[in-house]
Regions:
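P/S/T/G-enriched low-complexity
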Residues: 1-207
Length: 207
């Protein structure tokens, strides 16, 4: 017989999801971004149950299962293939390697500074394992409105979403991602924003 050529470990993988703004099905995918115990493939601890570690990763977290954000986080954090079955390896992006050690996104709505370490800054992608990066596109006005979560404001820039508005509040924990399942369609456009953050991609809201 013949031996198959190993897959290249340096390949980058992307998922681009487009919708009119709000999903209306009954998904079942589990809880992945709000777990209390998780070590990423490079040895970095995402969750160990301590308040200190939770504080570093608040922008990614919620307490709701079965969301797009859960799927995006799992696709990013869980290796797509076993590293030993690949030839070569993936390196973090150049943008990540050149990024500052910390970034201050200004103050949240309560006046608290929103500061993220480079590794936990969704602007950059530190992953060095086979993973999926998720980009989301919301193609209607519904993608930028969430009447069920009136305390959350979108960023100034929409194409792609920027890092002001309520983003600093998500960083500090002054705001939490709403219940995308129980809250129904009035809040689900926010799942597109959350999924892009969890998947280390960007959210584009276009009309």
């Amino acid at each position: 017989g013949t031996t198959d050529t190993p897959y290249l470990g340096c390949r980058r993988n992307y998922h681009i999801m487009m919708t009119d703004g709000r999903w209306n099905s009954s998904p079942s995918g589990g809880q992945h971004d709000g777990v209390n115990s998780l070590t990423l493939p490079d040895g970095t601890v995402y969750a160990d149950g301590t308040a200190t570690q939770i504080a570093k990763t608040r922008v990614f977290r919620d307490t709701i299962s079965d969301t797009l954000a859960d799927w995006a986080f799992r696709s990013w954090s869980d290796p797509l293939q076993v590293a030993t079955s690949l030839t070569g390896s993936l390196q973090p992006t150049v943008d990540y390697l050149k990024a500052p050690a910390t970034e201050n996104f200004g103050n949240d709505s309560a006046g608290n500074p929103a500061v993220l370490d480079r590794y936990w800054n969704p602007r950059y992608n530190p992953a060095s394992w086979p993973h999926m990066v998720t980009y989301t596109i919301g193609a209607s006005n519904d993608a930028t409105t969430w009447p069920g979560a009136s305390t959350i404001s979108g960023p100034t820039a929409k194409v792609p979403f920027g890092y002001d508005g309520s983003f600093p509040d998500f960083v500090t924990g002054n705001r939490n991602w709403p219940d995308m399942v129980g809250g129904g369609e009035p809040v689900r456009a926010l799942d597109l924003w959350h999924a892009a953050i969890n998947g280390r991609g960007r959210f584009y809201a276009v009309n």
